[in-house]
Amino acid sequence: MLKKDMNIADFDPQLFQAIQDETRRQEEHIELIASENYTSPRVLEAQGSQLTNKYAEGYPGKRYYGGCEHVDIAEELAISRAKELFGATYANVQPHSGSQANAAVFMALLEGGDTVLGMSLAHGGHLTHGSHVSFSGKLYNSVQYGIDETTGKIDYAEVERLAVEHKPKMIIAGFSAYSGIIDWGKFREIADKVGAYLFVDMAHVAGLIAAGIYPNPLPHAHVVTTTTHKTLAGPRGGLILSAIDDEAIYKKLNSAVFPGGQGGPLMHVIAAKAVAFKEALEPEFTAYQEQVVVNAQAMAKTFIERGYDVVSGGTDNHLFLLDLISKDITGKDADAALGLANITVNKNSVPNDPRSPFVTSGLRIGSPAITRRGFKEAQAVELTNWMCDVLDDITNEGTIERVKNQVLELCAKFPVYG
């Protein structure tokens, strides 16, 4: 018999300790991985609810199981809030991840072997935008565009040239490591010129878009996907949106999610998405996103002042790439040294990187998590100077230890969950 006082600590102390250690790590380390964030206790409450017990294959009002009247409400709330948040006429909140949302779009709009045009992973794209190691590059004919080596920005002339040459059935706009603002309208012009669908993956900037401080792709794209974590600060999951008022495409998308790619949806996660969307509709969410950009720009500026190269010379969003080629430091070594100082980043390839993706010559740095715990511009600048101190001499154990102690003091002043 199940009892409410059952707990992990008593039953599984090894797992409980791992959870406690991870909680401590999050509190005592500064998180600069651009795709990570801290979700609210309200989201955690919904995700840990009894809704995890309910199977609900299908969609609200059209389930294959009985007893779905309450989870239907949760999903309908998530759908309506997602539509309101992004100005959509269609929303599917069931994808378990951003990659599965992207896979559903491919399944709905393409046939195997169709040509797709997406951003190269080496230039800031995502695995699911046509990389040869992903389904998107294995099952479809993938053509890749990149950024201008001089400006660090998307080369729209190249995108158009490739589109005219290869006649893709779908063009993908979006990124996992690009610090500029994308001209969605220009992408749509190119797509219309060659008769292609425009598919936007806004996973990294969804929170900025929801707050109105980054251009919304919904008026331009046929289909838009996103994750629900990252800048949106919700649970880990995916979302598909559209505003083209095309019921035929909506039905194809729904069928591609279920039964095409998934079975039963995760109702506890969908409930958590509903909470996160409601949070994103609050005024303070806009203030948070504005600070995210301010902090990222302050960090990029400080790195440049300290003699480091930033791809494209700065950032217009929440992330930027630190190019370490001129410093003869690998991304792998920089990642490790900063990790010893309780600063978590991720090694990342930079444009025309001479090193392998397992070593790299750069770091991807993002500000959503530090801003979530309350950092303002002053703390962002202070932190960046500490990082430069470490990177200036990555084998100096004394410097690493000093910075680690400074990080611990700063984290104590700005707890994740105060």
From Swiss-Prot:
GO terms for molecular function: glycine hydroxymethyltransferase activity; pyridoxal phosphate binding. It is found in: Cytoplasm. The record marks 229 as: Plays an important role in substrate specificity. One of its GO terms (cellular component) is cytosol. It catalyses: (6R)-5,10-methylene-5,6,7,8-tetrahydrofolate + glycine + H2O = (6S)-5,6,7,8-tetrahydrofolate + L-serine. Gene3D superfamilies: Aspartate Aminotransferase, domain 1 (3.90.1150.10), Type I PLP-dependent aspartate aminotransferase-like (Major domain) (3.40.640.10). InterPro entries: PyrdxlP-dep_Trfase, PyrdxlP-dep_Trfase_major, PyrdxlP-dep_Trfase_small, Ser_HO-MeTrfase, Ser_HO-MeTrfase-like, Ser_HO-MeTrfase_PLP_BS, SHMT-like_dom. Keywords: Amino-acid biosynthesis, Cytoplasm, One-carbon metabolism, Pyridoxal phosphate, Transferase. Homodimer. Belongs to the SHMT family. This is Serine hydroxymethyltransferase. The gene is glyA.
